[in-house]
């Protein structure tokens, strides 16, 4: 009886098929994780808005931001780093203030390369200061809450804060909302 062995070609074909299947699984897994992080970002925004509204109900206004030091972005409060001081004034309304699931920078803050920059941002605009009114026309102050980047499809996130023809935070952030007082 003659023993049958696998030929080199047969072994290479099996290895190639395993490689293709592994790649397909990894791509699917990576895409699923990205979608989950985007969903988490939206859920976090909802959580933060609820906490901000509770703060406003108690104090009569939204909190002023605490610019994030040398990591700040144009006086915005951002969640970069460990997020320990991000929106610390919400501590009595949240067990822990959410931060972006990736929460990282790709070098200096450059929102033109947002595909590698992930953070949450908050800014309070005082309507009595014409520099910060941005043509919004609100009779009172307002706040903007945002996150920089979605990982899957930014077009599905329709929340883009705009005021008149002057201010469009959608140019800086994939998701942004205005909270008028």
Where would I find each of the regions flagged by the language model?
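Extracellular/periplasmic head regions of type IV pilus-like filament subunits
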Residues: 57-143
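Alpha-helical interaction segments
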Residues: 18-19, 45, 52, 83, ...
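A generic fold-level signal
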Residues: 3, 40, 137-139
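Short, surface-exposed interaction loops/tails
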Residues: 133-181
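Conserved hydrophobic/amphipathic alpha-helical signal-anchor segments
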Residues: 23, 30, 34-79
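N-terminal single-pass transmembrane signal-anchor helix
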Residues: 1-29
